[in-house]
């Protein structure tokens, strides 16, 4: 399982430096949606990381798909994350509440 990161060049830079290979720069809304769909189709990706503000930029239907996705598990960093907390996402993905 791999981690994929989609966002602005500044957002993905730190992930690249940390060794994440699947990083996709998306400066426009169209590129953001295109890269997210590309990651959703990639069976090797287990976690998709997005910036919280980018979640607000994508169409409602795709946002709902991401919020309900188990594989890949979608993590929005920073800002307000609509939907489930990280704890709930991990619980849904792994099947166990790791905080207990």
UniProtKB/Swiss-Prot annotation:
Belongs to the V-ATPase F subunit family. The keyword DNA damage does not apply. GO terms for cellular component: plasma membrane. GO terms for molecular function: ATP binding; proton-transporting ATP synthase activity, rotational mechanism; proton-transporting ATPase activity, rotational mechanism. It is a peripheral membrane protein. Component of the A-type ATP synthase that produces ATP from ADP in the presence of a proton gradient across the membrane. It is found in: Cell membrane. InterPro entries: ATPase_V1-cplx_f_g_su, ATPase_V1-cplx_fsu_bac/arc, ATPase_V1_fsu_sf. Keywords: ATP synthesis, Cell membrane, Hydrogen ion transport, Ion transport, Membrane, Transport. One of its GO terms (biological process) is proton motive force-driven plasma membrane ATP synthesis. It comes from Methanoculleus marisnigri (strain ATCC 35101 / DSM 1498 / JR1). Has multiple subunits with at least A(3), B(3), C, D, E, F, H, I and proteolipid K(x). The keyword Calcium does not apply. This is A-type ATP synthase subunit F. It comes from the Archaea.
């Amino acid at each position: 399982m791999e981690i994929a990161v989609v966002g602005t060049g500044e957002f993905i830079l730190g992930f690249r430096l940390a060794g994440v290979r699947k990083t996709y720069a998306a400066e426009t809304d169209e590129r953001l949606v295109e890269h997210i769909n590309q990651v959703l189709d990639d069976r090797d990706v287990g976690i998709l990381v997005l910036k919280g503000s980018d979640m607000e930029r994508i169409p409602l239907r795709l946002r709902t798909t991401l919020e309900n996705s188990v594989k890949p598990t979608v993590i929005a960093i920073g800002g307000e994350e609509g939907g489930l907390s990280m704890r709930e996402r991990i619980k849904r993905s792994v099947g166990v509440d790791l905080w207990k």
